[in-house]
Swiss-Prot record:
PANTHER family: SEPTUM SITE-DETERMINING PROTEIN MINC (PTHR34108:SF1)
UniProt entry tagged with the keyword Cell membrane: no
Quaternary context: Interacts with MinD and FtsZ.
Family of the protein in this entry: Belongs to the MinC family.
Reported function: Cell division inhibitor that blocks the formation of polar Z ring septums. Rapidly oscillates between the poles of the cell to destabilize FtsZ filaments that have formed before they mature into polar Z rings. Prevents FtsZ polymerization.
Keyword annotations: Cell cycle, Cell division, Septation
Pfam families given in the database record: MinC_C, MinC_N_1
Stated name of the protein: Probable septum site-determining protein MinC
Length: 246
């Protein structure tokens, strides 16, 4: 691809990257340019996990899929989701990050922490919770990072992980089965909501199970209690409509 070629432009944003695509270039030629652009930028992205959005060109579902596959093939970029201007998740993500960056409640504690202020409705934890680290809160929790195997979040409210969930989450610890758990990548060792427990080794379609799909395109998911079982679904509007905040 010519160094002066502007058919594919990658720009960073608060939530990930936006790829601007030439509107008139034949798609097959554009696809080659996407491959070249991301191949050249692969060292810059390294193993970064982020959302992606496309601008400048209307893509069919098949074209978008082919572009994502090319990006996955030529780079180590982990794409958690594809955002567009009408995407509700984008608004939620932006608002969570904005509040977290301006909040005095951002925490970097590597040791066991307990938040005891009864007025606290939501706490933010910025960083990765590693094995042996525990974050506790009297309200809900938003983790701006990953929860690694052996890491744990304990909350009286709900838990949202804006990253990979591979550790343990105890939500609604005071018996609140209306609490829920959301993660951009849902692969937990254990989730407990209220008094209901699900482990990664549990069988049954409604229980949590580690997926065998190794695709780098991750789907945000939500875990909630229904009929004394923990269900995990894609984070879509119909799933959100079933959530009670009482």
């Amino acid at each position: 691809m010519n160094v002066l070629d502007n058919s594919v432009i990658i720009k960073g944003s608060k939530n990930g990257i936006t790829v601007f695509l030439d509107e008139e270039m034949p798609f097959e030629e554009l696809l080659e340019n996407v491959s070249d652009k991301f191949k050249n930028a692969s060292k810059f992205f390294n193993n970064a996990t982020m959302a992606i959005s496309f601008d400048g060109r209307n893509l069919s579902a098949e074209e978008e899929k082919r572009i994502l596959n090319v990006i996955s093939d030529v780079s180590e970029l982990n794409i958690v989701c594809v955002l567009d201007e009408n995407n509700d998740i984008k608004s939620v993500y932006e608002e969570a990050v904005k509040k977290a960056m301006n909040s005095f409640n951002i925490s970097h504690q590597p040791e066991r922490q307990k938040i005891t202020d009864p007025k606290t409705t939501c706490m933010f934890y910025k960083g990765t919770l590693r094995s042996g680290q525990v974050f506790e809160a009297d309200g809900s929790v938003v983790v701006l990072g990953d929860v690694n195997p052996g890491g744990k979040v304990v909350a009286k409210g709900s838990v949202i992980v804006l990253g990979s969930l591979k550790g343990n989450i105890f939500a609604g610890v005071d018996g609140n089965e209306n609490a829920f758990v959301v993660a951009l990548e849902m692969s937990p060792m254990q989730i407990k909501i209220g008094d209901i427990i699900a482990r990664s080794s549990d069988s049954g379609v409604n229980k949590i199970s580690k997926g065998k799909n190794k695709s780098k395109i991750l789907e945000p998911k939500i875990a909630y209690v229904y009929d004394q079982n923990i269900y995990v679904e894609d984070l879509e509007q119909n799933a959100l409509d079933d959530i009670s905040l009482d």
